[in-house]
Curated annotation (Swiss-Prot):
It is found in: Cytoplasm. One of its GO terms (molecular function) is glutamate-5-semialdehyde dehydrogenase activity. SUPFAM superfamilies: ALDH-like (SSF53720). GO terms for cellular component: cytoplasm. Belongs to the gamma-glutamyl phosphate reductase family. This is Gamma-glutamyl phosphate reductase. The keyword Mitochondrion does not apply. It holds the Pfam family Aldedh. Keywords: Amino-acid biosynthesis, Cytoplasm, NADP, Oxidoreductase, Proline biosynthesis.
Amino acid sequence: MNLTTMGQAAKAAAFDLAVAPTAQKNKALAIIADELEANKDAILAANEKDIKAAVEAGISEAMQDRLLLTEERLVGIANDVRNVINLNDPVGSEIDSKVLENGMSLSRRRVPIGVIGVIYEARPNVTIDIASLCLKTGNASILRGGKETFFSNMELVKVIQVALEKAGLPAASVQYIEKPDRELVSQLLTMDDYVDMIIPRGGAGLHKMCKENSSIPVIIGGFGISHAFVDESADLERALVVVDNSKAQRPSACNALDTLLVHEAVAPQFLALLANNMAGRVELVAEPKAYGLLKEFEGVSLREAQEGDFDTEWLSYTLGVKVVADVNEAAAHMQKHNASHSDTILTNNIESAEKFINTAGSAAVYVNASTRFTDGAQFGLGAEVAVSTQKLHARGPMGLEELTSYKWVGKADYLIRS
């Protein structure tokens, strides 16, 4: 496999995509959706190979479920592509404009970024999500999925490329790195002549490697410790429902709750509710004050927090628990422990809510709502290519607009600078 050749082909395809009309891009998306359903037998057969390999490798059942494609899930993925068709195409839209004193009409117009390299985890639906969003925004993409979904991804990319050609667009608009070789990832990160942006979707190790080795701008997405703070004024029964949803609805999601902070004034009452609610379902990892309150309850899976626990993105049925003095201590804890993804305060006090909003450094901050809402579809953005936890270019769920840049357009009547 020659990555340089892939890069050259992607750059050439990006020029064609940048001027492709919305109707043509939507036609390609419609064909992709239809081809996914028409080729379901081949796709599911490829997925069976991945699942068999996962079982033989001893991969957890939770991870196997993330790898699994079913006919129902495939229909859902096809419909997600159709939903992208219905989203407004941001390319070519005017962000703002003004007329200068010299008579020039000056505006900013949205344009594609160019070629986007995406390195992502073992979820085959991500292949379709990324390809669809990049296509809609006129970006070419080079994808590198996890080895656990190799066969599934190869079949999915084949379907995408057939659809692109049927729509009159270059097949190289979406390419896939076939070998799960880390050396190829390292090479991709240095291909700044061809690739304009890198998006890693995975754990802290992948993000660190990309930041340290890439000569291409990197969007850091997904990783971050998510917190909930239960304030002394909170409605405890309703707060418990939000905490449960944040933690247990889908614990493997990047927006699932990792650490629960509880105001000391309500800690005895709330932790009693928490213990009964989480018993038999969630392991609680508690600092001394919280541990002392929780150990009184039977049936609770409980251990004392060790160094590094509050810096851990659990992605499982595990929850860190800490008692704090007030919203200020909660904010200080969050600043120390990588609160960059999604954080929520449960409170009936407006001042506490505003202080939390202003001090939280996360990409998404909530008042009396679950952390699980940090998602492109939930935000009304359609699908997402990633959830950015950095501060430059894009922040939070990255939908269509976040996959564009802009150019300045000046129009005048043969104007010269004096």
